Amino acid sequence: MSLVPYVIEQTSRGERSYDIYSRLLKDRVIFLGEEVNDTTASLVVAQLLFLESEDPDKDIYLYINSPGGSITSGMAIYDTMQYVKPDVSTICIGMAASMGSFLLTAGAPGKRFALPNSEIMIHQPLGGFKGQATDIGIHAQRILEIKKKLNSIYSERTGKPIEVIEKDTDRDHFLSAEEAKEYGLIDEVITKH
């Protein structure tokens, strides 16, 4: 069971209580602090769309501390980040691994950040399939296509040649915040808001 803190605000009309995530949303902050799956993707996508409808010209801030997760769920978030009119600024706090690092890199150019002790990890897609040989072959082909697509996007967003991305994502590749900046996954290491 997850504990969600509440914030109490004083207004001229009395007190108002918010769960912390709703209060952050008021300031255009979305927090992805767990595995990327269908549920978390639906929540993040809904928040992105809501914030766009509230003010299409004001930046959205997506804070990421995630071990990664589902590719299709992550791609739903990625596509929505690119679709909405406001720039989406990404900030890594703690760890952005796998799909978490992909989403970190998907932030608006010049607005991708990490705190100094953050860790970023990139790798190729994971898959585990069982069944008939023909079905396993279909899934293997699909994961190779996904790998190619993800590597292409990483290459485009980092400015690294596709061959470098392919080599570096062949196995788990861990980077400090400073290394992620040099690599092109983020734009700046920040210490203050």
Swiss-Prot record:
Query: One biological process GO term for this chain?
Result: protein quality control for misfolded or incompletely synthesized proteins
Q: Where is the active site?
A: 98 (nucleophile), 123
Query: What domain of life does the native source organism fall in?
Result: Bacteria
Q: Which GO terms describe its cellular component?
A: cytoplasm; endopeptidase Clp complex
Keyword Cytoplasm found: yes
SUPFAM superfamilies annotated for this entry?
Answer: ClpP/crotonase (SSF52096)
Q: Which UniProt keywords apply?
A: Cytoplasm, Hydrolase, Protease, Serine protease
The UniProt entry, under InterPro entries, shows: ClpP, ClpP/crotonase-like_dom_sf, ClpP/TepA, ClpP_His_AS, ClpP_Ser_AS
Any idea where this protein resides? Cytoplasm
Q: What is its main location?
A: cytoplasm
Q: Name one GO molecular function term.
A: ATP-dependent peptidase activity
List its EC numbers: 3.4.21.92
**Subunit structure of this chain's protein:** Fourteen ClpP subunits assemble into 2 heptameric rings which stack back to back to give a disk-like structure with a central cavity, resembling the structure of eukaryotic proteasomes.
Q: What does this protein do?
A: Cleaves peptides in various proteins in a process that requires ATP hydrolysis. Has a chymotrypsin-like activity. Plays a major role in the degradation of misfolded proteins.
Q: What is this protein called?
A: ATP-dependent Clp protease proteolytic subunit
From which source organism is this entry?
Clostridium acetobutylicum (strain ATCC 824 / DSM 792 / JCM 1419 / IAM 19013 / LMG 5710 / NBRC 13948 / NRRL B-527 / VKM B-1787 / 2291 / W)
- Record lineage: Bacteria, Bacillati, Bacillota, Clostridia, Eubacteriales
Gene this chain is encoded by: clpP
